[in-house]
């Protein structure tokens, strides 16, 4: 039985110029059989949402190391809702205080995977979220 691979967009939003970690995650997800699109650095919320919709991804993963999560995620969710994609699974990665992680979960971020999360845990989390949604 053929199964369509899980499609994931990994995005770097804002001025953060560090992408080594997100590239490691991208490789791990690809090695696990997922289709991965990497946005590159310095993307806007609008670019990320547009790409997620155009590429028909199952999961949008936003990596942040710059402390802008409380600004970026409200914009992303507003744009997703406006474009009829409010059901997209959104996860966050990077570095952030526990209180920020809790705040973005309340906005709709399904999982917050910080810098010390092993790649296999990220893979398992994405598979579980997509399976629970019943995608593909």
UniProtKB/Swiss-Prot annotation:
Cofactors demanded by this protein: adenosylcob(III)alamin
Gene disruption: observed consequences: Insertion mutant cannot grow on 2-hydroxyisobutyric acid (2-HIBA).
Annotated InterPro entries: Acid_CoA_mut_C (IPR006159), Cobalamin-bd (IPR006158), Cobalamin-bd_sf (IPR036724)
SUPFAM superfamilies, per the entry: Cobalamin (vitamin B12)-binding domain (SSF52242)
Activity dependence on pH, as recorded: Optimum pH is 6.6.
Record keywords, A-Z: Cobalamin, Cobalt, Isomerase, Metal-binding
Temperature effects on activity: Optimum temperature is 30 degrees Celsius.
B12-binding domain sequence ranges: 5-133
Highest rank taxon of the organism: Bacteria
Protein function: Together with HcmA, catalyzes the isomerization of 2-hydroxyisobutyryl-CoA and 3-hydroxybutyryl-CoA. Is specific for 2-hydroxyisobutyryl-CoA and (S)-3-hydroxybutyryl-CoA, and shows only very low activity with (R)-3-hydroxybutyryl-CoA, isobutyryl-CoA and butyryl-CoA. In vitro, can isomerize pivalyl-CoA and isovaleryl-CoA, with much lower efficiency. Plays a central role in the degradation of substrates bearing a tert-butyl moiety, such as the fuel oxygenate methyl tert-butyl ether (MTBE) and its metabolites.
Family membership noted in the UniProt record: Belongs to the acyl-CoA mutase small subunit family.
Name the UniProt record assigns to this protein: 2-hydroxyisobutanoyl-CoA mutase small subunit
Native species: Aquincola tertiaricarbonis
């Amino acid at each position: 039985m053929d199964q369509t691979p899980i499609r994931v967009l990994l995005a770097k939003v804002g001025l953060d110029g560090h992408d080594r970690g997100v590239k490691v995650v991208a490789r791990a997800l690809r090695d696990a059989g997922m289709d991965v699109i990497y946005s590159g650095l310095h993307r806007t919320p609008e670019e990320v949402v547009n790409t997620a919709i155009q590429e028909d991804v199952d999961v949008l993963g936003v990596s942040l190391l710059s402390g802008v999560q409380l600004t970026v995620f409200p914009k992303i969710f507003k744009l997703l809702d406006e474009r009829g994609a409010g059901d997209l699974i959104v996860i966050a990665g990077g570095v952030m205080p526990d209180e920020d992680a809790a705040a973005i979960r309340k906005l709709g971020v399904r999982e917050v995977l910080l810098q010390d999360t092993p790649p296999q845990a990220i893979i398992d989390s994405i598979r579980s979220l997509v399976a629970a949604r019943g995608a593909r």
